[in-house]
Swiss-Prot record:
Gene behind this protein: atpG
Organism ancestry: Bacteria, Pseudomonadati, Spirochaetota, Spirochaetia, Leptospirales
Transmembrane portions of the chain: none
Name of this chain's protein: ATP synthase gamma chain
Protein family membership: Belongs to the ATPase gamma chain family.
Any one Gene Ontology cellular component term annotated for this protein: plasma membrane
Amino acid sequence: MATPREIKKRINSVKNTRKITRTMEMVSTAKSKKISDRVNASHPFSNKIKELVSSLASLGGVVHSPYLRRPEKIKTVALLIITANRGLCGGYNSNVNRMAKAKIQEWKKSGVNVRLFIVGKKGISFFKFAGEKAEKTYTHLDDKSGYREAEEFANLFLELFAKEEVDVVEIASTVYYSSASQKPEVTRVLPLEPAGEGSVSDMMVYEPSPEKVLESLLPLVVKTAFLKAILEANCSEQIARRIAMKSATDAASEMIKLLTRGYNRVRQAKITQEISEIVAGADSLN
């Protein structure tokens, strides 16, 4: 049985750990709130741009753009996987990695070549262990990442798609729906999905021509898609870390309660034993 001193030492150790997890929980809460505000602020603009570009794309034969190319057979896919550089965020990284791995296997079974681009140390190490070679890796993204990084990715994949080096561009990341709901999903970025029938009004007139309007807007809608993915992945990471740290803090508090009870029992037993020894000693003198 552990001595009171040993139990007390363990209680202090758990208390120190609880301080760390509680601090991390508070930091993640503040970061997730800040990033979620950025996500919500970007939605109206990105939705409007996507709506306008989809309407232009639905004009079909009127508009010609390399970014609207739809190959008869998909030969090569570019897949960008967004994970975190750090752990301590529950199943955030493992969920994205498993989903992306399943998607890669699905493409390969169909005879499609997959070009991997991985963001985050956790994704890089996972796919290195799985034997999947990444064409490019990135570890510079953090909770402050935004439009500059989105533009970097967009320019790369727009160029690959325009040169017909890839037929499809997809992003595997965690999509943010609300503070209570985030899901790992694969989102297709290119080619652009045109709007449905009747989405363009006959009364709509574009100045300058639809081709020039689309040419200027299409790179922008792709950049907003990457921006959305980056922001939502970062926000989801912070929410997952907040939940994980809260669970750790609660578990530490429960452990402290149990250890304190054990400490009191051992201490009480020791005191009782000492009293018994004193009484026994007194009796022997009599």
